[in-house]
């Protein structure tokens, strides 16, 4: 990947996309992780005075992530607010009379965060910028109407392994680059722990699938896992179907 060309293309994409919305500001949910750091840095380069971050921790969130998110915003001149989502999560727990699984609570947390981002976008006349990478999108590793929701997404065609390298080029803090990727949905949660494979292994196969290359050299169990995830989760990337009754 040519980092200089990629940076220029993405900044141009962000500026053009924002201009078409007739709003003024970028809003990014900043977790202290890699993807949101890269996206918010690109937004800050595109519109230095018009980039806002919301930091949305829960009680279970790693305090290091909170500190990294704050440090990142201050380094890049991103105006930010911190809003705890714990009251929303507790209200959800209190409203249910059944056992709430981690996946249900995690999805709820992702949707609460996105609700707060969209509410903030209305407050300041802005748009929510997406932070889901190509690896996550192909695997369906995200919450529909949660972290997958956005007005536009500058990193949606970059694999996670590419983002690691691109982040170094952008001078993202090493402590953010080196930490284990996590959606921060529950205590101790990690992407690779959930998926059962590291991103390097996943991306190699995903890249081959995307380019319609032979998969013969790869482990069949891993291929099956990836192909099943792609098939079962592709609905997350589609707009709701509408039955066309007119015309």
Swiss-Prot record:
Deamido-NAD(+) binds at residue 111. It catalyses: deamido-NAD(+) + NH4(+) + ATP = AMP + diphosphate + NAD(+) + H(+). It is an enzyme of class 6 (ligase). Keywords: ATP-binding, Ligase, Magnesium, Metal-binding, NAD, Nucleotide-binding. GO terms for biological process: NAD biosynthetic process. Mg(2+) binds at residues 35, 136. It comes from Campylobacter hominis (strain ATCC BAA-381 / DSM 21671 / CCUG 45161 / LMG 19568 / NCTC 13146 / CH001A). HAMAP family: NadE_ammonia_dep. Belongs to the NAD synthetase family. Its EC number is 6.3.1.5. GO terms for cellular component: cytoplasm. Pathway: Cofactor biosynthesis; NAD(+) biosynthesis; NAD(+) from deamido-NAD(+) (ammonia route): step 1/1. Homodimer. The keyword NAD applies. SUPFAM superfamilies: Adenine nucleotide alpha hydrolases-like. The keyword Metal-binding applies. ATP binds at residues 29-36, 131, 160, 182. Catalyzes the ATP-dependent amidation of deamido-NAD to form NAD. Uses ammonia as a nitrogen source. GO terms for molecular function: ATP binding; glutaminase activity; metal ion binding; NAD+ synthase (glutamine-hydrolyzing) activity; NAD+ synthase activity. This is NH(3)-dependent NAD(+) synthetase.
